[in-house]
Protein backbone atom coordinates (compact mmCIF):
# COMPACT_ATOMS: atom_id res chain seq x y z
CA UNK A 1 0.00 0.00 0.00
CA UNK A 2 3.02 2.25 -0.14
CA UNK A 3 1.94 4.05 -3.31
CA UNK A 4 -1.00 5.85 -1.72
CA UNK A 5 -0.58 5.66 2.02
CA UNK A 6 -0.47 8.83 4.05
CA UNK A 7 -1.85 11.15 1.35
CA UNK A 8 -5.22 12.58 2.38
CA UNK A 9 -5.82 9.49 4.51
CA UNK A 10 -8.05 8.97 7.53
CA UNK A 11 -8.01 5.65 9.41
CA UNK A 12 -11.04 3.84 10.79
CA UNK A 13 -13.62 4.91 8.22
CA UNK A 14 -17.09 3.46 8.81
CA UNK A 15 -18.22 2.67 5.25
CA UNK A 16 -21.97 2.90 4.53
CA UNK A 17 -23.94 -0.37 4.39
CA UNK A 18 -24.39 -0.11 0.60
CA UNK A 19 -20.62 0.14 0.16
CA UNK A 20 -19.90 -2.76 2.50
CA UNK A 21 -22.55 -4.87 0.78
CA UNK A 22 -21.03 -4.27 -2.67
CA UNK A 23 -17.56 -5.01 -1.33
CA UNK A 24 -18.68 -8.30 0.26
CA UNK A 25 -20.41 -9.32 -2.99
CA UNK A 26 -17.29 -8.60 -5.06
CA UNK A 27 -14.74 -10.07 -2.66
CA UNK A 28 -16.45 -12.69 -0.47
CA UNK A 29 -13.15 -14.36 0.47
CA UNK A 30 -11.36 -11.13 1.45
CA UNK A 31 -9.65 -11.15 4.84
CA UNK A 32 -8.07 -8.51 7.10
CA UNK A 33 -10.44 -5.83 5.75
CA UNK A 34 -9.77 -2.31 7.01
CA UNK A 35 -11.74 0.73 5.84
CA UNK A 36 -10.15 4.15 5.43
CA UNK A 37 -11.00 7.45 3.81
CA UNK A 38 -8.51 8.57 1.13
CA UNK A 39 -8.87 11.64 -1.06
CA UNK A 40 -12.63 11.66 -0.40
CA UNK A 41 -13.11 7.97 -1.28
CA UNK A 42 -13.95 5.06 0.97
CA UNK A 43 -11.12 2.55 0.59
CA UNK A 44 -11.11 -1.05 1.75
CA UNK A 45 -7.60 -2.41 2.24
CA UNK A 46 -7.73 -6.20 2.33
CA UNK A 47 -5.98 -9.47 1.62
CA UNK A 48 -7.23 -11.69 -1.21
CA UNK A 49 -5.47 -14.96 -1.99
CA UNK A 50 -2.57 -13.88 0.22
CA UNK A 51 -2.03 -10.57 -1.57
CA UNK A 52 -2.63 -6.95 -0.65
CA UNK A 53 -5.50 -5.18 -2.42
CA UNK A 54 -7.47 -1.94 -2.23
CA UNK A 55 -11.05 -1.31 -3.40
CA UNK A 56 -12.10 2.33 -3.86
CA UNK A 57 -15.70 3.60 -3.54
CA UNK A 58 -17.46 6.96 -3.93
CA UNK A 59 -19.41 8.54 -1.07
CA UNK A 60 -22.60 7.08 -2.56
CA UNK A 61 -21.15 3.55 -2.51
CA UNK A 62 -20.28 3.24 -6.21
CA UNK A 63 -17.25 1.04 -6.86
CA UNK A 64 -14.53 3.00 -8.70
CA UNK A 65 -11.50 0.69 -8.90
CA UNK A 66 -9.59 -2.11 -7.25
CA UNK A 67 -5.82 -2.45 -7.03
CA UNK A 68 -4.41 -5.98 -6.85
CA UNK A 69 -0.83 -6.94 -6.05
CA UNK A 70 0.25 -9.47 -8.72
CA UNK A 71 3.32 -11.43 -9.83
CA UNK A 72 5.37 -10.82 -12.96
CA UNK A 73 4.19 -14.04 -14.61
CA UNK A 74 0.57 -12.84 -14.21
CA UNK A 75 1.11 -9.84 -16.48
CA UNK A 76 -0.41 -10.15 -19.95
CA UNK A 77 2.14 -11.30 -22.53
CA UNK A 78 1.91 -7.94 -24.33
CA UNK A 79 2.84 -6.05 -21.15
CA UNK A 80 5.78 -8.37 -20.38
CA UNK A 81 7.08 -8.07 -23.95
CA UNK A 82 6.81 -4.26 -23.90
CA UNK A 83 8.61 -4.04 -20.55
CA UNK A 84 11.38 -6.45 -21.57
CA UNK A 85 11.93 -4.69 -24.92
CA UNK A 86 12.46 -1.40 -23.09
CA UNK A 87 14.19 -2.54 -19.89
CA UNK A 88 15.49 -6.05 -20.52
CA UNK A 89 14.94 -9.15 -18.42
CA UNK A 90 17.46 -8.33 -15.67
CA UNK A 91 15.88 -5.10 -14.40
CA UNK A 92 15.06 -5.51 -10.67
CA UNK A 93 11.31 -5.11 -10.10
CA UNK A 94 9.98 -3.78 -6.78
CA UNK A 95 6.23 -3.86 -7.28
CA UNK A 96 3.63 -5.06 -9.80
CA UNK A 97 -0.06 -4.24 -9.63
CA UNK A 98 -3.22 -4.66 -11.68
CA UNK A 99 -5.77 -1.86 -11.47
CA UNK A 100 -9.33 -2.71 -12.53
CA UNK A 101 -11.52 0.36 -13.10
CA UNK A 102 -15.25 0.90 -13.36
CA UNK A 103 -14.95 1.86 -17.04
CA UNK A 104 -13.92 -1.76 -17.77
CA UNK A 105 -10.27 -0.84 -18.35
CA UNK A 106 -7.36 -2.54 -16.68
CA UNK A 107 -4.02 -0.87 -16.07
CA UNK A 108 -0.81 -2.70 -15.14
CA UNK A 109 1.71 -0.89 -12.97
CA UNK A 110 5.38 -1.89 -12.73
CA UNK A 111 7.83 -0.21 -10.36
CA UNK A 112 11.43 -1.13 -11.15
CA UNK A 113 14.94 -0.06 -10.21
CA UNK A 114 17.31 1.67 -12.60
CA UNK A 115 20.16 4.21 -12.63
CA UNK A 116 19.79 7.78 -13.92
CA UNK A 117 22.93 9.93 -14.24
CA UNK A 118 24.69 7.58 -11.82
CA UNK A 119 21.97 7.81 -9.16
CA UNK A 120 19.77 4.87 -8.11
CA UNK A 121 16.23 5.54 -9.27
CA UNK A 122 12.79 4.02 -9.49
CA UNK A 123 10.81 3.92 -12.71
CA UNK A 124 7.04 3.78 -12.49
CA UNK A 125 5.43 2.38 -15.62
CA UNK A 126 1.74 2.07 -16.44
CA UNK A 127 0.62 -0.14 -19.31
CA UNK A 128 -2.71 -0.98 -20.92
CA UNK A 129 -3.58 -4.66 -21.41
CA UNK A 130 -2.27 -4.55 -24.99
CA UNK A 131 1.19 -3.42 -23.84
CA UNK A 132 0.82 0.27 -24.67
CA UNK A 133 2.86 2.43 -22.28
CA UNK A 134 0.40 4.93 -20.79
CA UNK A 135 2.68 6.74 -18.35
CA UNK A 136 6.33 6.64 -17.34
CA UNK A 137 7.69 8.53 -14.34
CA UNK A 138 11.14 8.40 -12.78
CA UNK A 139 11.99 9.07 -9.13
CA UNK A 140 15.72 9.85 -8.96
CA UNK A 141 17.14 9.27 -5.48
CA UNK A 142 19.69 12.05 -5.17
CA UNK A 143 21.87 11.64 -2.11
CA UNK A 144 23.39 14.23 0.19
CA UNK A 145 27.15 13.70 -0.11
CA UNK A 146 28.21 16.15 2.62
CA UNK A 147 29.27 13.22 4.77
CA UNK A 148 32.04 12.55 2.22
CA UNK A 149 33.80 15.60 3.68
CA UNK A 150 33.66 14.55 7.32
CA UNK A 151 37.07 14.08 8.93
Regions found by a protein language model. Name each.
Residues 70-72, 140-143:
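A short acidic/small-residue loop/turn micro-motif
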Residues 11, 141-151:
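Glycine- and aromatic-enriched low-complexity segments, predominantly in secreted/extracellular proteins
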Residues 23, 44, 83:
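Short, structured motif recognition centered on aromatic/hydrophobic residues
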Residues 62-95:
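Long, charged/polar, surface-exposed segments that mediate recognition or autoinhibition
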Residues 2-27:
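Bacterial Sec-dependent N-terminal signal peptides
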Residues 27-28, 87:
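A broad structural signal for alpha-helix termini and local helix breaks/kinks
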Residues 32-50, 92-114:
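A cross-family detector of function-defining hotspots
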Residues 41-68, 110-139:
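Amphipathic N-proximal alpha-helical interface segments
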Amino acid sequence: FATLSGVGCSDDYNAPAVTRSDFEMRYPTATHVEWEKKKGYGVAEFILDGRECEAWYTKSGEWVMTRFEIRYNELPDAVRVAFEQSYGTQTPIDDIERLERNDNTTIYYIQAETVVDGFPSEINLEYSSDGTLLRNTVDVEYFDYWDDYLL
